[in-house]
């Protein structure tokens, strides 16, 4: 089932799945951790991410990492992916 969010000031809709993929790719590609504010700023004014959608995407990404060798963590300056301690010796 596809979840759509409509911004009250816009005719554009963003799918939560797409928001999640954008957030994941942005954090993965960033040379330093990204804050929530920086992630929201990635979305243009004519197609903004709905309030709460970035936080939801981060939560979903963190859960999806449960069975992976990486984790999405929050540090002082924002969010980043890092290798989990349990597999660190092999990487």
Task: Show the residue positions of the predicted features.
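Alpha-helix N-cap/helix-initiation sites
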Residues: 16, 32-33, 50-51, 72
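Phosphate-centric recognition/catalysis
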Residues: 1-12, 18-19
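Charged low-complexity interaction tracts in eukaryotic proteins
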Residues: 2-7, 59-88
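Short acidic/histidine-centered micro-motifs embedded in hydrophobic/aromatic stretches
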Residues: 26, 42, 57, 75-78
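Short capping segments at the starts of secondary-structure elements
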Residues: 26-35
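Pre-recognition alpha-helix immediately N-terminal to the DNA-recognition helix
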Residues: 21-25
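Short amphipathic alpha-helical interaction segments
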Residues: 49-60
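A short acidic, leucine-rich amphipathic alpha-helix
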Residues: 35-42
């Amino acid at each position: 089932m596809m979840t759509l969010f409509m911004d009250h000031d816009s005719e554009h809709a963003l799918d939560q799945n797409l928001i999640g993929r954008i957030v994941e790719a942005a954090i993965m590609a960033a040379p330093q951790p990204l804050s929530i504010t920086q992630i929201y700023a990635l979305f243009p004014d004519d197609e903004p991410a709905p309030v709460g959608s970035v936080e939801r995407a981060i939560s979903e990404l963190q859960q999806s990492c449960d069975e992976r060798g990486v984790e999405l963590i929050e540090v002082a300056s924002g969010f980043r992916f890092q290798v989990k301690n349990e597999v660190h010796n092999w990487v």
